[in-house]
Amino acid sequence: MKNLKIAVAFLPLIASSPAVAATVSDPVGDFIPSFTGTASPDLDVTSFSVSLDQSATMFALGAVLAGDIDPSLAGFYVIGVNTGSGTARPFGAIGEPNVTFNQVIVVQKNGTATLGANTLTTLLSGNQFIVSVPVSLLPSTGTTPVNYGFNIWPRFGSTVTGNAQISDFAPDNALLGANGLLPVPEPATWLMMLLGFGLIGGMIRFGRDSTKAAIAQIA
């Protein structure tokens, strides 16, 4: 019944704009070794989905957890977004170097979700939630929306205090796009990307550094 309620609520969006979509499954109980928080089922991702409508104006991001989401237990969910220039990769030390991003969505257990200063529409029921994200809030930095990459990681606690708070990643050490898992760039590709960014870096460095600092506080 809970699953049906969420599906029905999003039916107008899906019916009016056929989408490309992809889902990745994640094993139950695969808390990462570096996690030091309380291993509650609602911090264990079992599937993550990315859907983009036909007009490429709206993403629907969905997550299913191993247990009902309990607001009385400390924790929240972070979704990293790579819109093309996502060179932030802070999780190499905990075995997730390919989780790269340049935007962050935060979903609280009470159903509120934010992207920067913007509040997003969220449906939360039982052990799952869906967040609706306008593409206009995720401007491209080098690729098309259908090729944007996403990853979700739950955090224990109420604020970001370090990587030991992170319980799980979905997908593991990868990014999910609307067409499926995204390939990991070869080292030479990364080098060319970084050189290209360096050519325009002097023009946008202040804004970029400010964005990185802001992301570091919430991711």
Could you describe each region identified by the protein language model?
Residues V20-F76, G80-T112, F156-L182:
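Order/disorder boundary and secretion-linked terminal/linker segments
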Residues L65, V135-L137, L195:
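A mature extracytoplasmic/lumenal domain signature
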Residues G201-A219:
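C-terminal membrane-anchoring or membrane-association module
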Residues G126-F169:
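Ser/Thr/Pro-rich, low-complexity mucin-like regions
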